[in-house]
Amino acid sequence: IAPSILLKDGKPFMVVGSPGAARIPATVVTLIVNAVDYGLDVEKTNSAPRFLCQRSDQFLSLEARFSTEAQDGMKKKGHQLQLFGDFDLFFGGAQIILVDSSGTMYGSADPRRGGTAMGY
């Protein structure tokens, strides 16, 4: 699943990958949803708060940057929350490239991990 290459009309639209063992699928899917479903730009896609819910966990793990309202809503639905730091490496360290309709590429290195997006 990592790296993943998404095509739009047969052309590259998004390239994404992250380390994180069992957490890789959740991280990659969250980033794809941020870009495809919510239309976020590459930096917002990569820096948005993350969560993880695994079948083996009794907790819904999430970054503390989720709003109090969102956290309260999750608790009301019966979730036990496990809060992590604002940009916690627990949720991966993704690298993303988004390609617009003109072919221009935009890269992002996850703020949770050291890195830089560069091109030429």
Set out the residue ranges of the language-model regions.
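Proteins synthesized as precursors that undergo proteolytic processing into mature forms
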Residues: 1-87
